Each structure stands twice: as structure tokens, then as C-alpha cells.
Amino acid sequence: MSKYIIFVLLFLCVACDKSLDNALQQAGDNRSELEKVLAHFKDDPDSLKYRAAKFLIENMPYHYTYEGKAIEAYDSIYLQMADEPLPERNKFFKERTDSIRFSDKRFAVDVQTVKADYLIRAIDEACDTWRRTQWQDDYDEELFFNYVLPYRILNEPLSDWRTIIAEAHPYLTEPVVWSKRGEQMEAEDADFTGNLTETESASEGKMVMLDHDGAKVTYTYTVPAETRKVLFLRYTATARRARVALTLNGRSIPTAPLHPANSLKNFLTSRSATLVTLKKGANTLTFAYAGDTIGLDYLQVAASELYHPECAEDYSNDYCQISNKHSGRYLTIGLHPDSLPCVATLKRFVEGDSTQLLRLDYKGYACWGISVCYPDSDFCLETEYCSVKYNSPVGLYHALNGSNQKWVFLPTGDGHYRIMNKDSGLFLEAKPVGNTDTLVQNPYTGKDTQLWKIERKGKNPTYSSLFRLGSALSEALRLFDITGQFEWIGYESSLPPRASSLLSGKTGNCRDEADYTVYLCRSLGIPATVDFTPHWGNRSNSHAWPVIVLSDGKATPFYMGCAPADTVHYYHSYKKPKVFRHRFQLNEQYTRDLSQEEEVPQLFNAPKFTDVTDEYYETTDVVRDVPTDYADKHVAYICVFDNRNWVPVFYGNIRDGKVTFTSMGRNIVYMAAFYEHGQIVPFGEPFLIKGDGTVQTIQRNEKKRTTLKLLRKYPFMGKEDFFNARMSGGRFQGANLPDFSDAKTFYTFEGLTNGNWYKIPVNDEGKYRYLRYIGPMGSHCNINELEFYGTDGAKLSGSIIGTEGDPWASKETVFDGDILTGFSGVSPDGHWVGLKLSLPQQISKFKFIPRNDGNGVEIGDEYELVYWKDGDWALLDTQIAASNVLTFKNVPSGGLYVLRDKTKGHEERIFTYEKGEQVWW
């Protein structure tokens, strides 16, 4: 058992009544620092601060980080990585951290290292923020202590992250509301002196190059009154931390450096907003060359409007009518539109017309959904096709919780409202058409056609909403405007970055993404934390994600790229055996249950989390018999399968020869085990918790034999990933002219790819010298391998031709025989890859494999099939693949199997074999 676990257990044994005194004893030379904190808050007028200090100090013995030169170097490399183009960050980080020697790192327990000044400042900032919130009285103090107050989330090095957020994002505490996007102003439509360049990936196929002194783009922007706007650039640049010079009406405006693209054919949107105040009338905005080459596609002008939430009217409990000041007509939402989307209309008032009776659903900070009154109808008002263009139609569609379906009511002071779309920042306007008005969106000009009256028309008896005005969850919608600045990468990092570095770099893996969101939430006094599954139930690896803690102690996810509480747009097929919730406080129940164990798995070292699986799924309590040889054991562990081993995800207490594992996820195969000498020791047979909660033991049948035909060693998880649709619309062609102007399309791929080889016959008697695959728009022409065959069945060879690919994904990779390498064009559009033959040939067929995980059966690789037998994996047979299908005969039926590739790779997955197919678990 590690020294740290001994420390925790000894501390816990005496912590029941004297936890503060014991923490101070454990502090050693740092005791005086912690006593300064207690003395500082002892007589503070806000008694919450003293209780907060006690809570933190009592729990500091269970929190730690690492210190030393290696840790500082590690953090520095993270920040350097953040300045690299997104596709290159993973490689950059790995290459530079591989050389770091961590032998000098020091284990630093918080109670022995955190100083008084830091802790006092952290407590002041957290408590003062909490006192300013509208929701402080909704929450128990313990929820504040665990999910707002803490100065750290995991074991990251410490920093003053609250101050950093306040300085970087003052908007978050100002009485304003931003639109998610805004009006789009093309560079080529402005006045410019740079070079106009055609490029397929620009929004209109053109960009203006700012690549020499004097090159500039000048926009003229007119507003009816002084107003603030938020500027974003759509641009391309390859220099690290590239700069562009901005002047507004001749006055220089500071801008943040731009992140690099991996080529000048890839476009990015600036991650940091530039806030400007425009004067009444015409304004000139000039973007000029400042030493770095930048291709400017367009300027996006988002709205920033004053909004005072404490003065907002709450319409959520009432049915309402909305009428236009100019025409007096009423917004009308039909129950059965002929087609969707359809244009919304205004009609003259008709007594008793239910289509003019509206339900206003509160969607979070300043935002409302506008729907017909009937609760079983999901038709709502939206900007069609998420348009940000002037005079574009506003219509009806099914509610999808998109920003284009959210509306901001801004009072004008005369009983009317301006109604702004949250996505576009444009305003709802009536457009007369005969006896009705249609609805469009336009910049606000003050016309009566843009002014609206909202009248209450009786109570809404079916009102039910997760959002309430003035709630923590409502406030979190403000963060939705900036969480998109974070860029995910799949890099491997055992230590979380320092919070200040994370908030600056805004990039990382799922853990970092979750931490980033939680820091932002807590800076506003929004209770938030990280939920995690210690290991997926049907694939390798663990996962973590951010959640907002509600006043009842339960939580709702705040997935990156989604509005808070929006789970509809975040789907995958991964199963969670357990979901735990990080907190600052030690889980004393878990520690007591495990206190008699000589050693415990790493997961349960000082467990500062609680089980919340029941908040996510229907679960099952599982009871398993314990072998008599282990009668002296107090706990056992329930495990799921990793690539090679059984991994513990929870424990159960043993009583009367049985162990009970509570609240386990369903549709997952498990194994019960003990933990001895640092190893998992399975007992019994694997078992499946089925979808209905019943438990099925997986028992092999040695007498009943069967034949297995196997295609893969691991399930294809890519079917939910973004790249799986990238070949839809891609064309395979032959031609005799090098520019393919005479191209004949052999085949067009439609739909989603499955990660396996495709073999396509070609019914064409023509002969072609040039052969290619051309990807659809937005796909980067992703394809991993491509083979063409002649009429004699032989694979054709020739000179590799095509467009430019990324350095790590050139066109040559499509013909290198490695299914894990493939082509990726330097920009999303206009790419292709193929062969130039020495002579024209008739094509009989072609084969290709899309982006994939490399887990399909590969010809020439050596495989072994094993099954679970008597507490271990037993070998059944070994084969070298002669095709992309392996056939194993005389196999015991009903078992749990694993197919291993002995030639290469590491991903493997358990499966059963049912009705002639692999069933993955």
C-alpha cells in the first residue's frame, strides 16, 4: 500500500471530530500559513468565508500536485503547442515531452504547500462572487463548498484562474447579451488594396491577401445609434501568433494574435472576440497588413446589446400574443404546416384563434423560444437555414434548441420590444405581403416594423422548463458564447495543465475540455464539476465531461459545442458502467469500506468523488457468489474489459459469501475480481447485465461446437465520428485527359462508411489512362487506400497524381499499402488523388478503404482467437489471414472471445457470436 494511502487512512481514522486540528497537524511547517487564513476570516462580517476556509483546510490533505523543473517544462510545452496549427499539436507535444525527465518532480500535498495569500484570495473571490449571484439561496452550503469554492479541480499546478478569467472575459459580468454569430461581410465586397485571390475554401471562393505594406481591407458599417459590436475574422494565416492591424474611424484598436492554419488554403475563425463601440452613422473598419501574411475571407459582426436580467419579464408561466407596432397584426403559428421549414406570418387578430396564442419557453440567459401554445406541438420560430443575411426569412421548424431558434426580448421603454435572434444578431421585422405580413430579419433601424408588443393571455397550465430566470443554469448560457474557443485534440497527458495555461491555450483532450468549462462556470459562481466514467463499458479508455450542478444536487451536462443541458445533439454508442462526480471533499464512505484492504486500485486512492450513475441511466444491483477460498475478503471489484485486461470500475461489500455491486450500467459485460499484489484476480464467469436489468452469465459450451467467421478484432466506433460521412458524394472516375475534362464517373459513394474495405465492380468497356477519387466539398478528400484492377485481375500501377495534401497525409499515402495512413487535402474543398497509367486500360473493379481504425482483418497478418476459460484467456487457434475474413472451426459455442492481431496493433475487444455475427461488448 502506498504511503499516500496510508496517510489518508490514518487521517480518516481520527478525522471524525477533529478534522481541522488534524489537518493543521499534517501541515507541518505550513501550519502557520493555514492558521493565518483562519485568523483572517475568523471575524469576517461574512461568516461564510470562515466556514469555507475550514472546509478547504479540512480537505486539503487529500489534494496534491507535482512540482519541479520538469513540471514547468511540461506546462511550457503545452503553451507552445497551443500556438501550433490544430492538426500538428498532438505530434508537437509528444515529440517535446518525450525528452523530459520527470525524476526531479516533487509530490506536493496541498496542506503542506499552499500559502496563506493564495488561499485567502481564492476564498474571497469565490465567496464574493457567490454573494453576487441571484441563485445563492437556492443551494445548500455543501454544494457551494464542493462545486464553486475549490481552488483546484484535479491535481493541476495552482494558479489565480479566477482573476485571469475576469480580465480575459469582462463581458461575462457585464449587463449585455451577445449574439452567437453575426452579419457576414465579404472582404472582396469591401474597399481593398490587397491581392484578390481565388480559393475554393473561402465562403464565396475569394479572399483578399494582406501580404505587403499598404495592403488593407476597409469596411463601411452604418448604425442608427451608438452601439457596441463584436468582431470576428474568417481568415487564413500560417505564421504563429499572426497580427493584423485594426483601425476604427482612424483610431487603432488592439486585437488578439491569430492562431495559425496548416496552410493558406485552410480558413479559421478568430477565437478571441474584438469588442468595438460604433458611433451613430457611418463607421470605417480597416484591417491592414502588420507584418504577417493573412488571407481575409470575411468579417463577422456580432451583436452586443445591453440587457439587465434583474429587470426581465418572465413570460414562461403564461400564454402570450405578439403583435407588430406598424401593422397591428399578430404572430400566427399554424399547427400543421404543409412543409417545413415554412415562412411565419402575421395576421389580423381573430378572437379565439389558438394559432395566435403563443408559448414562450425560457431557454437560458436572455433567450426565449416562441412556439404555438399546444404542448404536444414542437413547431417554433427560427431563422431559416441559420442564415445571417439581411432580409432573410424567419419561419417555422421543429424545435432543435439551436441558437437560430432563440430570441432575445430587448425593451424599448414604450411597452414594446426589439426581438433579436440569438444566432444572427439581427432583428425580427414585419414585411407586408398583401393581407398578411411575413417575417424577416434585418439590422435594427428603429422602424415600427421592428417593434413588438407582448401581451399575457392567461396561465400556461403545462409550463415545465429546466431553465428559470435568475438561475445558475440560465447564467451558463452566457458561457456558450465562448466555449467554442476551445479546440479539442487527442493528445496524451498524465498531468492536467495549469489552469492559467489552459485558459490561455484553450486546447486539449476531454479532461482539459471539461476543466476549461468548469473553471468558466465557477468564475461566475455557477456550481459545476467534472463527471467521469473510469472506463467505457464497450470500448477502451475512460472519459470526462463538464456538468452544471443544480440546486437539488443533481446535475445536467454542459457538453462543449452544446448549450447547457442540451443532450440531444451529443450522441454516441459508448456505454458507461459507472459515472462518478468529482468533488473537493473526500468520500469517507468509500474510504471506510476499503479501510481493511491491504491495497486498493489506483481509482480508489483517496476517492474524492461520488456515484451518480443513477442520474444517467436505469441501473442494476448485481449479486455474485464469492468463492469459499476468499471467505476472509471484505470487498471485491467489478471490472470491464480493456484491450487486454479486466479493469476495476467499482467495488462491492462482501456479506455472507456474496458480493453486491450497486447501480451498475446495463448492456455491458462484467467480471468480478479481487485485487491482490497490484493485480486483478478474476473469479467466476463473465456476466452480462442486459437492457432490462436481468443478469446473464456467459458460459461456454465445450460440447456444442460452432464455426466463427470474423471480420474485425475491435468494433468500428467511427460510425458516430465526423469523418464517417466525408466520402458521401465522392466520385471514382477515369479519363484520358490530364485535367479530367472528359471524366467518366464509375461510381459515386453515398452514405456513411464502415471502416472496412469496399470492392466495387466497374461495368465500363472504355479504356482510361487517368484514374482518380475526387472528394465531396468539405471532406478534405479523405481516403486511406485505393486500388484499381485491370481485366486480367491484376492491380494497376502508375504515377501518383492529385492535389496537395497535408505534410502528414500526402497523396502518396493512398498507395502505400498501409490502411492507417491516408490523404487529407490542405483545405476542405477541391481535392482529388489518383494514378496516371503508362497506357490506357479497361478497369474491371476497384477497391478502397476509407478513414478507419485499422482493426479490420488484414491479409497477411497473423491472428489468434482466445476465449475465457477457467479464469483466464485460453488459445483456440492461430491463423494468417488469406482474405479479409477469418474462419475458425470447431470452436466451443456460447463463450466470450477475443481476436488478437499478433502482427501489429493493440486494440482488442470481447465479443460473443450470435446468429452468425460478432456481437461486441
Predicted segment positions?
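Extracellular carbohydrate recognition and processing domains
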Residues: R251-G281, A743-V762, D877-K889
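Short beta-strand-plus-loop segments that form exposed binding edges in beta-rich domains
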Residues: T286-I294, Y773-S779, R900-H906
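Hydrophobic/aromatic-rich core segments of domains that either
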Residues: D43, D140, T163-R181, K457, ...
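Secondary-structure boundary elements
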Residues: K49-G182, K457-G505, N541
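Lectin-like carbohydrate-binding module/patch detector with strong preference for beta-trefoil
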Residues: Y307-N460
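Short Pro-Gly-centered beta-turn/loop motif in secreted/extracellular proteins
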Residues: K658-Q679, E765, N890-S893
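Extracytoplasmic
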Residues: R181-H308
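Disordered, acidic Ser/Thr/Pro-rich linker "stalks" and the adjacent N-terminal cap
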Residues: K180, D191-G205, R705-K767, G778-I843, ...
